[in-house]
Structures are given as structure tokens and as C-alpha cells.
Amino acid sequence: YLRSNLMSSLIDTYIFNLQQNNILNSYFEINTVFNSSPDNTFNDVPNQNVVLGFITSANLTTQDIRKSDQNIDIYYVKSLINQLINDTQLEPIIKPGFHQNYSFSIFKNNEIVGHFGQLSTELQNNFEIENEVFLGEIYVNKLNLNELKLINYKPLSQYPFIKFDLSFSVPVEFSAHL
């Protein structure tokens, strides 16, 4: 089927992982979405756009027991978008599925390049989600990829993180009865 947005599948992914007690609760997807306007090249084909979709909880948890959970708000999400895309402007929007006071269109050079916001309270209650959820889409086709900020990637350690390292001193005379 042809998807018109990534948000519905991201919400499904978020809920599935929530039900599986997966504590990592930020997800993204880059994929093609379609709309009913005609394609620029072929008139009989729906318009296709490459979209970056994201979803995150207001309560970010970590598997690293040395760090505490982080509570975020809509302004933190806005700052992440600004870190990725230079010189964006935001305008409030009213969009189905989004909280009416916390949803925004993202503009760059007076052109809409995406939208984001908080999941509506009604949907949050319907899906039985306790924490606030922020989600959005960025239209990659509408961005000049050469203007994106370069973010240095730090590779993950090749050694797995160890939660506990336990050592025991056992007397020599200790015997295990098998």
C-alpha cells in the first residue's frame, strides 16, 4: 500500500515496543510517502517524497545505569531540529492527531519542510500511553542536503556495556555439591 505519512507506523512501533517493555523509546524512519498531487515528471503517478519521521517520549530512559532518565519538552525537540537544519522558522498549526497548542510547521526559506508536535491527549489516552509523546516528519526532498549541519558521529564501542561486574572471594575449603 502507498503510505501518506510515517507517523501512523511510528506510533504503532512505539506502542509495540512499549508493550514489550522495551525501555528505548525514541525511533525514526526514513522512507517514501505518497500524496494525491501529480508527480512532477509523470502525471499519472502519485507524488513521492522522501521523509524522515521521528517519535520520542517525553521521558527518555537509558540502559546505562550510571545515567538518570531525562525529561524533555517540545522546546527540546525544537532544539534538535535546529541542530540538524539551519535557519528554520516555526508556525503553529492545527493538525489532526497533534495537540492543538503544541504542533508546528517547520519552514526554511519560506517553504514548508516538515511539521512536528505533541501527540494529542485524546490519542494518548486512546493508546494508553502514560508519557507525553512528540513526533514529526521532515521532508528530505525539500532540503538542500549540502546545507545540513555536519554532525560528527562517534562510533559505538566494540565491547558491550557491562551493567554489573561481580567478584567473590571464596574460601579454598568451599565445596560445591553437584
State the predicted function of each range.
Residues 1-178:
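Extended beta-strand-rich architecture
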